[in-house]
Amino acid sequence: MNKDHTLYCSVYIRNAFFSEIGIGISANSCLLLFHTFMFIRGHRPRLTDLPIGFVALIHLVMLLLAAYITEDFFMSSGGWDDITCKLVIFLHRFFRSLSVCATCLLSVFQAIILCPQSSHLAKLKQNSPHQLSYFFIFLSIFYTSISSQILIAAIPTQNITFVNLIYITNSCSFLPLSSSMQHTFSTLLTFRNVFVIGLMGLSTCYMATLLCRHKTRSQRLQNSKLSPKATPEQRALRTILMLMSFFLLMSTFDSIISYSRTIITGKSTALLCPDSCRS
């Protein structure tokens, strides 16, 4: 009975993982194809089209890697060699970091575009794509240095006799790190998450403030009373706040869980896979 219940739970969790990944791959593929099609048709691109397409591409690669890892976690009998194990886990963590970084920079870029000409940020409008590109490259190098420990810690599971391995998939595991190394990487990851999430939150608040000011000025110029129908500014504000609030909430929750799992030693369990693969 317990075996049947465990098998049922495993199948249920596997289907949930693949459904989530499938929805993400479909959505990002459609978004990327849409922007590619618009570019091929010769439509004049907006300033945000290239960053949005780039974010969709990063998410697509990350989700494809996640599908490969999930397949090995639930279905494979363990067939990765040392190079495949290190490369797949490293690339997945790297692209997940780029996903958070690119989404944050997209939020900053949108805030710069919306800023009025009288703002100090208006000077950055023309050069912002280049400056944000340099900043993105810097963060990519920083994330690579943080994730480099995977190239040492990740090993294939076959023919390994270590007791305290942290199992990632059926084919790949993590060697236990020393307490000082764990706290070092946890501190770096926490600093990264606090910085990126904080910057995204500030950008969201700035955009919300600009939209509220624009709505107030429009009503004053038109001498109109509040209409029960939502204005374009209100709809844009609700959309921005809803999306960013959800992203910030999930990122914060994921960071807390990842940090908590990292500082707890001696608990080698397969449930560490989502946080170990995505941190």
From Swiss-Prot:
Chief subcellular location equals membrane
Alphabetical list of Gene3D superfamilies matching this protein = Rhodopsin 7-helix transmembrane proteins
**Null allele phenotype:** Mice lacking all but one V1ra and V1rb gene (12% of the V1r repertoire) show a lack of chemosensory response to a subset of known pheromonal ligands and changes in maternal aggression as well as male reproductive behavior.
Q: Does the keyword Cell division apply?
A: no
Give each disulfide bond as a residue pair. C85-C172
**Which regions of this chain are Extracellular-facing, per the record's topological domains?**
1-19, 71-93, 156-159, 209-238
Query: Record's superkingdom?
Result: Eukaryota
Native organism is Mus musculus
- Which InterPro entries does this UniProt record tie to the protein? GPCR_Rhodpsn_7TM, Vmron_rcpt_1
The GO biological-process annotations, alphabetized, read as: response to pheromone; sensory perception of chemical stimulus
**Record's GO cellular component, any one?**
plasma membrane
- Residue spans, topological domain Cytoplasmic: 41-49, 115-134, 181-187, 260-279
**Membrane topology recorded in Swiss-Prot or TrEMBL:** Multi-pass membrane protein
Q: In the UniProt record, does the keyword Ribonucleoprotein occur?
A: no
Q: Per UniProt, which keywords does this protein have?
A: Cell membrane, Disulfide bond, G-protein coupled receptor, Glycoprotein, Membrane, Pheromone response, Receptor, Transducer, Transmembrane, Transmembrane helix
This protein's name: Vomeronasal type-1 receptor A8
Matches recorded under Pfam families: V1R
What are the glycosylated positions? N159
Q: Name one GO molecular function term.
A: pheromone receptor activity
Task: Show the stretches that span the lipid bilayer.
Answer: 20-40, 50-70, 94-114, 135-155, 160-180, 188-208, 239-259
Q: Where in the cell is it found?
A: Cell membrane
Where, by tissue, is this protein expressed?
Expressed in a subset of sensory neurons located in the apical layer of the vomeronasal organ.
As for what it does, the entry says: Putative pheromone receptor implicated in the regulation of social and reproductive behavior.
